[in-house]
């Protein structure tokens, strides 16, 4: 789970303007951080299937946001992929 400071840091890094908290970039960055944390948890707790289901749901949500961003603005999509290092 993200604490307030970490969440604020991520929002500040990816926001488009001063009061931005809900742009696709911010949402994708927050989901990516939560996914990475949950992934580390599942490496240790392999049989935690409830958390695995939540992880899959978050990955699907991030995928939908990325698809939306790709359809609306390809340049912003490429920038967020590059910043978060999502593609290998």
From Swiss-Prot:
InterPro entries: Ribosomal_uS15, Ribosomal_uS15_bac-type, uS15_NS1_RNA-bd_sf. One of its GO terms (biological process) is translation. PROSITE patterns: RIBOSOMAL_S15 (PS00362). Signal peptide: none annotated. It comes from the Bacteria. GO terms for molecular function: rRNA binding; structural constituent of ribosome. GO terms for cellular component: cytosolic small ribosomal subunit. Pfam families: Ribosomal_S15 (PF00312). Keywords: Ribonucleoprotein, Ribosomal protein, RNA-binding, rRNA-binding. Transmembrane segments: none annotated. NCBIfam families: S15_bact. Belongs to the universal ribosomal protein uS15 family. One of the primary rRNA binding proteins, it binds directly to 16S rRNA where it helps nucleate assembly of the platform of the 30S subunit by binding and bridging several RNA helices of the 16S rRNA. Forms an intersubunit bridge (bridge B4) with the 23S rRNA of the 50S subunit in the ribosome. Part of the 30S ribosomal subunit. Forms a bridge to the 50S subunit in the 70S ribosome, contacting the 23S rRNA. This is Small ribosomal subunit protein uS15.
